[in-house]
Amino acid sequence: MVLQYNARYNPVPAKEFLFMAEKKVDHSCTLDKIISLCKRRGFVYQASEIYGGQAGAWDYGPLGVDFKRNIQNEWWHYMTQLRDDVVGLDSAIFQHHKTWEASGHVAHFSDPMIDCTECKARFRADQLIEDFVSSHPETNPGKPVDTMTHEEMKAFIDANINCPTCGSKNRKYTAVREFNLMFKTYQGPVADDSHLIYLRPETCQGIFTDFKNIVQSNRMKIPFGVAQVGKSFRNEIIFKNFIFRTCEFEQMEMEYFCKPGTDDGIFEEWRKYRWAFYLKYGIAEKNLQWHHHDKLAHYAKDAYDIQYNFPIGFEEIEGIHNRTDFDLSQHTKTSGKDMNYIDQEDGNKSYTPYVIETSAGLNRNFLAFLCEAYEEQNVGTDGKEDYRTVLHLHPRLAPITVAVLPLMKKDGLAEKAQEIRTMLKEDFVTDYDQSGTVGKRYRRQDEVGTPYCITVDYETIHETKEDGSPNPDFGTVTLRFRDSMKQERVKISELRGFIHNAIANYKPVVR
């Protein structure tokens, strides 16, 4: 069972996370385990926790901010630096309010909302039905929820669903109506329509309004793409499932401009390219699936979601859409500015480009990669159970790449370990830990996904053995691998290259 939170009628418990999944006795990955790990190890905290928490808002801690930035950096590398046809942009969060009129957000960007008339709790009608049907499959409405009319949603809810908040069996609900998801405010001291402004609900519109600037300043030729990572804001009716659905989130989007008639083939190419990204960074193919939209958005010709198998089931982590020429045509119409492209390679033909969009949620990627990496692994011997919690994160995503551990704090081992850490800092994100046994320190690093641990011991610093003979391991350290727990002696002088090579040749764990 996943608890739902209503900001108005359900105060946040002072010392609790909001959305804890039901605990299980086995060693599988559950949402409550991920939430617990995130807080305990500094990945994610509840925002404003000392004041009871802010609904749908989360802070990314010391490890979380590096993990999230690594995902973003790898996405950027994969989408722009490995390609010759994609450039970057960082557009403003605040855009002219007519931008959102042209895009259709003012008229169409809404979710179906329904209220319980007894406790006044509000719900997204479509999600209320989906959650109910997932636990009561025999009540399937017989058609996809996203194709149901408001009247059909209302009838199904009245006939089947007791209020999740107050538990009332009377099923007294309001009519289903649309709730616009944009946050709006006013810029400056005057609160009138001429100063109306919105927090952007998606990053892509800044790309469309800058289309002509990018073409002219960078001499871009179609086909080409523009990538962007940034924050977006949606006034969600319901927040649930930890960081999966929140009001403030980050998107990693790319808009690919192409000649009309070539869009279908390019659409399929981007579907394959984006699918391969998740496989490359460690998501098992069995945990991914495509979802084809039965009901398309007002701007779309075709749309697929990449869904990941979270502990809560398959949910979207990225959408790939054929937006046709809708956005550029709408901005031409609303602004009066010509957004056509002059194709010099096609006899100076003028046309409005079609757009293929890839839109990934950075926060949802964060959660998906965590869930995929999480394992409670039995490493016991002689028939005894001994479980370690380990995150099998790809080394390029892990918040810490290398931990340096002195065997003891004394006899110059700590100083040598710090010297080695300093040497590695230029190349890798490092950690230093000298508290507790080496075994316990390994476990701490496993739990946060550190792929490599270096142990500095007496063999490292002693040129000779106790009998006076040469020590062949002088100037070496023990390098321990997270996934296999195997250990290898490596020369200090070769550490940088050895670790770089290990990262370059890393193979995701298959489970």
Task: For the regions a language model picked out, list residue spans one by one.
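NTP/phosphate- and nucleic-acid-binding module
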Residues: 13-511
